[in-house]
Amino acid sequence: MKRLILAAMLAAGMSGAAHADDALKAAIANSERASANVARDGARHPYETLTFFGIKPTMTVVELSPGGGWYTEILAPYLREKGKLIAAGESPTSAREGARKYAANLTKKLESKPAMFDKVQRGVFEVPTTYDFAKPGTADLVVTFRNIHNWTGNGDEKVKEIFRKVHESLKPGGVFGVVEHRAPAGKEPKADSGYVQEAYVIKMAESAGFKLAGKSEVNANPKDKADHNKGVWALPPVLANKDVDREKYLAIGESDRMTLKFVKQ
């Protein structure tokens, strides 16, 4: 049954840009996705987020720092037949042990379901040193989900460098789609809170030549005031404070997130 559903999903992906929404819905409904990932669809809004970015099944898409592969499970089958997905993460040969571990975990993930991941290409995106994920001017869409807070500790110049590398990788008119934990406007977040000011992200993007093409509130959560002990990780799904105020954090839900669409002119 799972193979039949996956086959139907892939067929939907081959039906062309006119039916891109149906193909994306099919990718999200794919029964091969991990159940724990599916359970978070209501908080992460993958359909609304990706359609806002303008994704099409014929695109070359770069996913920066795919982590555990939450979005990779959707992007890989969606792009499998007519597009290309580049999973850009740590290098398997990195000098850093932690980076090699992340790379090995991603390899294990991709090799676990070849029918879903067999056409995923790998690129290197290892902050703050190595960015070798796509040739200049070849990507239609680059996406990053809740990663920018991991870049900021390296300083503004390093953050600007990352945005420049993304800009360089995109075709003219290409899109950089960003989702990030959002600090309240005018409130400087603690460095280790996981939150970033929206104005800061826009400033960094514009410094690299991007134009802000749109904002979406699809991933907004007004209940999140970004003032938690242990930062954003106090909230689901991590619940870093364990049983302390657990019900309070569950009632808040996942973080308030900016969703920004930048275009290379």
Where are these regions (language model features)?
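Conserved class I S-adenosyl-L-methionine
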Residues: 56-67
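Short glycine-dipeptide loop
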Residues: 58, 81-82, 170-176
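A short glycine-rich, Lys/Arg-flanked "PGG" loop and its adjoining helix->strand segment in the class I
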Residues: 76-77, 157-172
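Conserved beta-strand signature within the Rossmann-like core of class I S-adenosyl-L-methionine
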Residues: 86-88, 163, 173-182
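A short acidic, Gly/Pro-enriched loop at the edge of an enzyme's catalytic core
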Residues: 117-120, 131-142
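A short SAM/SAH-binding and catalytic strip from SAM-dependent methyltransferases
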Residues: 129, 139-160
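Conserved Class I S-adenosyl-L-methionine
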Residues: 189-215
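C-terminal lobe and adjacent flexible extensions of AdoMet/dcAdoMet transferase-like proteins
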Residues: 247-265
